[in-house]
């Protein structure tokens, strides 16, 4: 058999061994390696390579090099080399060469170079001398690594419960009482609903995470495969922590990640074990709310005020712009898109939010039109069914062009929905159901079905002469007896009404409540106009009798608290026109001014000061046209 010493096999083997030895000397090898070396024909020789230094990943404070050998923070080190020496010694190390500050290795003092990656700005640096890798951390990153941050929404809720418990219902009620006058029953319902929403999140989120982990792990895996998966996850997290320079057992972040790995292991019972078990975890379900009441009673204001004091995302959506899928208008998914936007596009945080559906009565179906599709009424209600109950909604991503695939999946199971609407004419439907006398009419009328017929009957009743206080009391009494079948007759489909189990009727505002709205709450109407006049160095005084007269006018208009601002704008139009750039220092409004019997009273400054102001203002006004003419000429 001919010898192969002179053939190319020997040369290839020599090159392979040489490259292996060079790699081992550079530090790629992780321990003792047995390698077979080709020798004489038919024999093998084994050489044992010595242990090569490991490439370690640590997190240590690195110092900036300067010309005089002093670090950036002022602590000098004579043993460390200067920037010029390091650059002259390793000219091909890959430094930028722009003359800026360079990072030194905290182990040997040699200059560190940035690791070349596909990212233009990398935070990893390496030392060519001691083969150490480092992560450059900013001050903000260092602070974040010390403080334990929650790894998921469930841990964030648990941490919030431990550090600061959720506000009790009484505290939420007192906060709403500062901005909204009256409606005590609605405030109590909303306060309790928000508090229970916090508790439901705390109770349900861990169970959902376990179910999601079980789906991802596949329940058909054997215990051996589960153990292998668990070790793989631990290995991944350990390597990740080593790259970041954090020990998996010596740091709070490492402990939390290790705990997260253990939590992701499915621990729920499977198959026959579920049938044999007598104990099961309680899952709290949500109770969506429906607020109904006359216009201007404070439904939207309650939602806006409630959004300020919550630690969960809150979105207010207008149902009047919603249409069925495929038609011009906003899609139903835009409701969740607004919530996701309020959560800064954090999906887990958005899945714990609260959605307020305003003007929900405007999507009531219109009966009698069987040939046409009610795309803005019953079609929207049908699209909201699964949204209210809990489903996966595909929401377009941030800054996406609504192309295929650019969506985010949001689970609405734990999102609380609060709907509100005026439901004009609902009291007449309740009266007909109860066969009671309604505002002087003897026999029940043949009123048509649907929200349009009810609203038309209510509008016809408003145009007639009647006692305002009697109307308010009768409507409030009837709305307290509202039932699901009344809402169905109004135009809401039974499936939609059934998903709003808590129905809260709001009472109309009386004269006393309207007077309180003018003055008492924060951001009241009268203080707003006083602030406007104070910018012109003028005071606004409104007497108590004038406040009562304004409240009576608002009651007659039957527009609720919104009528107050309309009346105030009409009363103060002339004063707001006369006060700027004048000598008026006070405006007085009394009962006769509200009734239209006289003009508002003005209190002016002394005559001498006013004449000087008029003279100065006249010169300025005449001077501007003269200067403009001179410039044009």
UniProtKB/Swiss-Prot annotation:
Basic and acidic residues composition-biased segments = 69-83, 598-610
The observed outcome of changing residue 298 to D is: In EPP2; results in decreased ATP hydrolysis; cells with the mutant protein show increased ALA levels and accumulation of the heme biosynthesis intermediate protoporphyrin IX
Domain of life, source organism:
Eukaryota
> Broadest EC class?
hydrolase
Catalytic activity annotation: ATP + H2O = ADP + phosphate + H(+)
Chain intervals with Low complexity compositional bias:
84-93
Tell me which Gene3D superfamilies the record gives.
Answer: 1.10.8.60, P-loop containing nucleotide triphosphate hydrolases
Region annotation (Disordered) ranges: 68-100, 598-633
Q: Name one GO molecular function term.
A: peptidase activator activity
Annotated protein name in UniProt: ATP-dependent clpX-like chaperone, mitochondrial
Question: Which organism is the protein's source?
Answer: Homo sapiens
Q: Which gene encodes it?
A: CLPX
